[in-house]
Amino acid sequence: LGGLLRVYAALEDGLLRRRGHPLVAPFVLPALFRAPALAVDLAHFLGPAWQSRLAPSPAAERYAAHLDRLAADAPPGLVAHAYTRYLGDLSGGRLLRDRAARALGLSEGPGLAFYDFPAIPDIAAFKADFRARLDALPLTDAAAAALVDEANFAFAASAALFAELA
């Protein structure tokens, strides 16, 4: 969870810092932000001093550094990461939440906050709106290709995060 927190914090900070960019602005959606929920879960599992107990994750640090560079130099790239991370969370979140709840003996609240989106009452409609925002972006072919490249990077970076857990 600590590695995920580092990644989401970098993504969400980048989105907020670049919210004035016309391609980024439609994707600054705090209802999706996961860093606060991850902090709740980490406090539940590790206690009040959870921040001092996190072990560094090389894969998370590489991913977060990449997101920081995008925020500084190529903010539209953040959109691809928002798409892959958040739509993945919304799509598989319920199944993963149920599995985590059974494995951890939890029913709701702290420990499972990452999987809950209380500000999104209709997940399917929200996902459709997110995709519509993406489809409406005025992208050149080169810009669209750059977003695809970033989405592929996001998948590879996520795989590296999970490989560290194995």
Feature-to-residue mapping (PLM):
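Metal- and O2-centered redox machinery and metal/ROS homeostasis
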Residues: 1-166
